[in-house]
Curated annotation (Swiss-Prot):
Gene3D superfamilies: Ribosomal protein L28/L24 (2.30.170.40). NCBIfam families: L28. Pfam families: Ribosomal_L28. GO terms for cellular component: ribonucleoprotein complex; ribosome. Belongs to the bacterial ribosomal protein bL28 family. It comes from the Bacteria. Coiled coil: none annotated. The gene is rpmB. Keywords: Ribonucleoprotein, Ribosomal protein. GO terms for biological process: translation. PANTHER family: 50S RIBOSOMAL PROTEIN L28, LARGE RIBOSOMAL SUBUNIT PROTEIN BL28A. This is Large ribosomal subunit protein bL28.
Length: 62
């Protein structure tokens, strides 16, 4: 489950670098992932990778 958000499923996207001469080469843009530790209701903690935008939402509602 590398390079993928645990909650939203956001993953790498593929696009093009376009030069002034209109030459196109492939590029990959990776999500801004952060590794966080979530505490579960039973007291244990789990380490998951989440996108930074998801982390903002988690902090907003917790």
């Amino acid at each position: 489950m590398a390079r993928k958000c645990f909650f939203t499923g956001k993953g790498p996207m593929v696009g093009n670098n376009v030069s002034h001469a209109n030459n196109k080469t492939k590029k990959r843009s990776l999500p801004n992932l952060r590794s966080i530790r979530l505490k579960l209701e039973d007291g244990t903690s789990v380490r998951v990778k989440v996108a930074a935008s998801t982390l903002r939402t988690i902090k907003k509602y917790s």
